[in-house]
Amino acid sequence: MTRQKSVLRQIALRLPEIASFCCAALMLCVIPLYFDDAFFNINRCKVSLIRTATPWLLALMAVSLCASRLPGEKKRLERPIAPDICMAAFLLACVIACARQGFSEDVTEAANGRNLGLWLMLCLCAAYYIVALGEIDGRLLAACMLLCAAICAGLGILNAAGIDPLGFYQNIKRKLKITFFSTIGNADFFGTYLLMMFGMA
């Protein structure tokens, strides 16, 4: 019985790390490679996945943090570091900018702006803090980044050479191909995604 309690205790203490790893895997390995059949819908499908998954991951992290604070455990919260503060300041700036526009659908959803609205920013910020709170090994994060970057780059090189193993560029006009980066999507989405995930580095 004592051994079972010890195992459960260890699992409970590792829950934040597990939740953090799930979020990191989604954001760093799944999102860049995820796309659907409609090429011009690539940003929309990525945004939809982020907005669907992030609230659940945030809830999982909240439950994990509560479960990890077992009786007798005195786990001290780490002081925020520069990227944490910068991300919070950026999020505050986004909220203030949207508030000045009355939180209209154009700024929250941004359906006419490649769906890069406030809701996406909130989800990406939440993902950053979920990963930060889990305190997972930085080497693991770097490995996830490099793995996905290598796959995206490899696909991009193949596409540029006229090889399209995923049928990614079918029916796309030649002049439009240069605005997309492999499976990462349109340059606008790539810039936003890179900015928000840069803090993880």
What is each residue range found by the language model?
Residues A12, P16-A19, S64:
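Generic L/I/V-rich hydrophobic alpha-helical segments across diverse proteins
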